[in-house]
């Protein structure tokens, strides 16, 4: 009896955070800085800042396969290598091996994952955009899904709080559909992008073209240098891990902040099996954890639990947390748990060559970690489309073709080689980024008949685009070509690649926030309606998807929920 009591005491914390990625790192930082002894659980390996970025300074000739994946490794990652960084030798080590982490695709869904301390914060695209007022109101206005239990004004101060800490380079553009934030100096558009910007401003009253807002430090402030972070070197090798700490990641930012408090315990190699629910107390008391190396099961205890294992895994943990009170998963009184899975629609690509001659003697200098961006303009203000609701944005880029344009060319000889040393024509590209609606039939389920090597049930994912997404794609494809035509850019490729959901790596929903416990899993502070000391603040909590990159919103939701949780703890309400 004494032994069991002593073990429980040693395994008891004020708070437990499940996951160490973008939102999990924020939860750990906020809870420890508010004085809570916090255990952060990570299912994957530990990754130390700088020392565990093995390729961060490697040139192509220093790589065993010159940056390409060897065939035997490529065969193990058929899903992961569909996304850029996983498809090369420089960044593949931050992605899972598909053969070790199987799941069933009822309909095609490309699930990209990074199982290590830091999660996908090590290889994210770093585009950070606030949601706007419409994004939080459209569900209610249009009768789609459930009404968000919060509005933009509830999250605005937390957006500012997060932006100041992570460091966001951007310009105050004064665009209603893309609210301004707390920005460091922006990176600069190149000459063709500036030309495109002027064209858009002259031709359209409702459209804008801007430098993207990115979580790379153009000019660090004191809050950044105090954590050892320095300015972005514009190497564009971000997906290898940044030795300068110039882009926001758990390793560069939230983890060292949490460690400084002396209140954090980090435990890698720890798969959370389930959350322990006490029927008598009516709340969660801890978690069951599988050691990935020994398969030993251990229980840890805390007054509050933050679930930040990334959308699909967070929901899987809730679904696997069954009890007499919750036979269908923790908090699943509504039946919404596992449903309304969303991703962003990145299907359209349009590219072309600028036909003007005024930039032939111009070039861009160095590299840049930020692309350019056309914020959403559809179904806002006076624009109302008859074929679809919501809207899309574009990620854009411009540059001059280099020697790679000679690949596949039948030419040879000295003259050909000499011509390849000169800059090629200016090119421009646009990728559509569309909102996906919360469809009830897009869902995940546990598969009890198929277990992984740790004895956990695998997942079945059933997700597809619907008519609204398909019609939005057609409009995005046409509008991109129209804008490029106005700018004197000859379109050389324009297509819908029909890729399945998942590849935007913005999966969200499945444990949505809402006002009514009968139709949602979480309340306005990301609490499980029926289990108030469990908070879910990653993408699983989203009630709609907007078309902006979602990570900034996850971080703001997490900081807000942590602040609320600690205040409620002090009131003895949790």
Q: What residues fall within each predicted segment?
A:
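A glycine-rich dinucleotide-binding beta-alpha-beta segment and adjacent secondary-structure elements
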Residues: 210-218, 235-238, 273-277, 423-436, ...
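N-terminal glycine-rich phosphate/pyrophosphate-binding loop and immediately adjacent elements
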Residues: 2-139, 144, 149-153, 157-160, ...
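Short, glycine/acidic-rich hinge or "gate" loops at secondary-structure transitions
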Residues: 49-51, 169-181, 490-499, 571-574
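Glycine-rich loop(s) and the adjacent beta-strand/alpha-helix scaffold that form part
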Residues: 33, 37, 42-64, 244, ...
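Conserved redox-cofactor binding core of oxidoreductases
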Residues: 64-110, 115-116, 122-130, 135, ...
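A conserved FAD-binding loop/helix module that cradles the flavin
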Residues: 544-562
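FAD cofactor-binding and catalytic pocket of flavoenzymes
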Residues: 92-120, 124-130, 148-152, 334-459, ...
């Amino acid at each position: 009896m004494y032994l069991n009591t002593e073990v429980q005491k040693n395994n008891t914390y004020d708070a437990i955070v499940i996951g160490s990625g973008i939102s999990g790192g924020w939860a750990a930082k906020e809870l420890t800085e508010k004085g809570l002894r916090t255990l952060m659980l990570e299912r994957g390996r530990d990754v130390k800042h700088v020392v565990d970025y093995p390729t961060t300074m490697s040139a192509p000739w220093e790589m065993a396969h010159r940056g390409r994946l060897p065939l035997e490794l490529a065969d193990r990652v058929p899903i992961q290598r569909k996304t850029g960084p996983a498809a090369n030798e420089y960044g593949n080590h931050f992605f899972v091996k598909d053969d070790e982490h199987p799941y069933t695709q009822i309909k095609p869904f490309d699930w990209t994952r990074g199982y290590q301390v830091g999660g996908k914060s090590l290889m994210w695209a770093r585009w950070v955009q606030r949601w706007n007022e419409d994004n939080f109101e459209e569900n209610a206005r249009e009768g789609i899904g459930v009404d968000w239990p919060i509005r933009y004004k509830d999250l605005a101060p937390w957006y500012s709080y997060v932006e100041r800490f992570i460091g966001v380079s951007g310009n105050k553009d004064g665009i209603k559909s893309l609210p301004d934030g707390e920005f460091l100096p922006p990176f600069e558009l190149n000459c063709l992008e500036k030309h495109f910007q002027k064209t858009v401003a002259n031709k359209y009253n409702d459209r804008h073209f801007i430098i993207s807002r990115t979580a790379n430090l153009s000019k660090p402030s004191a809050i950044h240098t105090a954590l050892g972070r320095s300015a972005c070197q514009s190497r564009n090798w971000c997906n290898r891990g940044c030795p300068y700490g110039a882009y926001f990641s758990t390793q560069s930012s939230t983890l060292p902040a949490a460690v400084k408090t002396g209140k954090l315990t980090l435990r890698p190699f720890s798969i959370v099996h389930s959350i322990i629910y006490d029927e008598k107390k009516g709340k969660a008391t801890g978690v069951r954890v599988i050691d990935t190396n020994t398969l030993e099961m251990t229980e840890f205890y805390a007054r509050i639990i933050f679930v930040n294992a990334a959308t699909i895994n967070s929901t899987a943990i809730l679904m696997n947390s069954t009890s007499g009170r919750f036979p269908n998963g923790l908090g699943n009184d509504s039946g919404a748990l596992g449903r309304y899975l969303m991703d962003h629609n990145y299907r359209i690509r349009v590219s072309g060559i600028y036909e003007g001659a005024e930039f032939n003697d111009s070039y861009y200098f160095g590299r840049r970690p930020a692309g350019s961006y056309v914020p959403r303009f559809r179904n806002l203000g006076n624009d109302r489309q008859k074929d679809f609701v919501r809207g899309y944005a574009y990620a854009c880029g411009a540059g001059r073709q280099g020697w790679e344009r000679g690949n596949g060319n039948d030419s040879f000889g000295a003259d050909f080689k000499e011509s390849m040393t000169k800059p090629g024509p200016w090119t421009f590209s646009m990728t559509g980024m569309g909102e996906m609606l919360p469809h009830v039939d897009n869902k995940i389920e546990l598969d009890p008949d198929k277990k992984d090597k740790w004895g956990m049930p695998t997942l079945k994912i059933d997700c597809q685009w619907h008519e609204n997404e398909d019609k939005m794609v057609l409009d995005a494809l046409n509008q991109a070509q129209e804008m490029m035509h106005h700018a004197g850019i000859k379109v050389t490729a324009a297509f819908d690649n029909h890729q399945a959901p998942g590849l935007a790596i913005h999966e969200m929903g499945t444990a949505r926030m809402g006002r009514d416990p009968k139709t949602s899993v979480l309340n306005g502070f990301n609490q499980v309606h029926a289990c108030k000391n469990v908070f879910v603040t990653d993408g699983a909590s989203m009630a709609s998807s907007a078309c902006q990159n979602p990570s900034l919103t996850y971080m703001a939701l997490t900081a807000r929920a942590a602040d609320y949780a600690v205040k409620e703890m002090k009131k003895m309400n949790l």
